[in-house]
Amino acid sequence: MKVHEYQAKEILRRYGVPTPRGIVVDNSEEARRAATELGGRVVVKAQIHAGGRGKGGGVKLAKDADEAAELTQKMLGMTLITHQTGPEGRVVGKVLIEEALNIDKELYLGITLDRRLGMNVIMASAQGGMDIEEVAERDPNAIHREPVDGVLGVQPFQARQVAYALGLEGDAFKKCVDFVQKLMRAYIETDAALAEINPLLVTKEGDVLALDCKMSFDDNAMFRHKDVMAMRDFNEEDPLEVEASKFGLNYIKLDGNVGCMVNGAGLAMATMDIAKLAGGEPANFLDVGGGASAEQVKNAFRIILSDKNVKAILINIFGGIMRGDRIAEGVVSASREVGLPVPVVVRLEGTNVELGKEILAKSGLPLITADGMWDAAQKVVAAAKGHQ
């Protein structure tokens, strides 16, 4: 789960992580009052769940309260397009008015899980204020990585290593060490999946602050954090993904035209790969799980069909806990309820597979059956091309 910049900073402040003073607004008059309260010279920042806002025109410097109000009026309601939003962009509903600071250095600091190491890793670079992916590609050695033991936590010497890597000294060095330790505590205690400070700002006065902050959280841990869960902004999420989550379905919308319904994340990814190999483009990732009911299958079917880009659907089920007859009943029920506006290819294997195939055969529906994954992939790609 993602949160907005102003929400991430609110979380960080609870842990003593320094951030600039800021006020979130949703109209120009509030922006005028906020800018006046913050001293007049402020930064106006569009709040969307995506990076690259500056390049897209979503971050502007205002010299006084009147200009802040004018910029806010222009930003609110605009569709902001960045390299992370895709061509459809995101509509701006809130704006953060933040005090302007005297910048000396812009650095990068981030914490995330390194699955290869099985440890959280602190990443730091003196090349802040830009996409860290670009830095990693251009100059991998410019990023310092500090793995953190899950039991011991971040040690003082590790925080000092990070400050050294950022080239800091004097008061800024000491403040950075404190910043790193507090950021790690915030990351761990909120079950975050990412805490990214870009840029980490060093002011001319020697202060160290989070000028921008991006945080995301482990969905499976949110039952422990009702306060963070309350920050969820459904307007920033794909409506189909929100709908799927209500039924316990793991759904991620993609840009292709081959809808996929699969049980198990590994098989779902393999199904997407083989559809791509056969010349198709997956329209989604959808894992119905190991114990889905016929009702869940029906809802999964309906959600896939809600995507107007879908030209054919591949249902690929290996029955272990999930029985083939239950899937078949769900497919038949969903097909009769919503109709079959696109071709549907079904591949069943495992528990009760023969019973499942029998249910499909007796349904009288124009379902296309397949004997293996490659056969299914070829059939669904051909069906999608024929249904353009």
Q: Whereabouts are the PLM-identified features?
A:
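ATP-dependent carboxylate/acyl-activation modules
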Residues: 1-197, 201-315, 325-327, 336, ...
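Short amphipathic alpha-helix used as the core "switch/output" element in two-component signaling
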Residues: 332-333
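Catalytic core of bacterial c-di-GMP phosphodiesterases, primarily the EAL and HD-GYP domains
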Residues: 320
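Short internal beta-strands
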Residues: 341-350
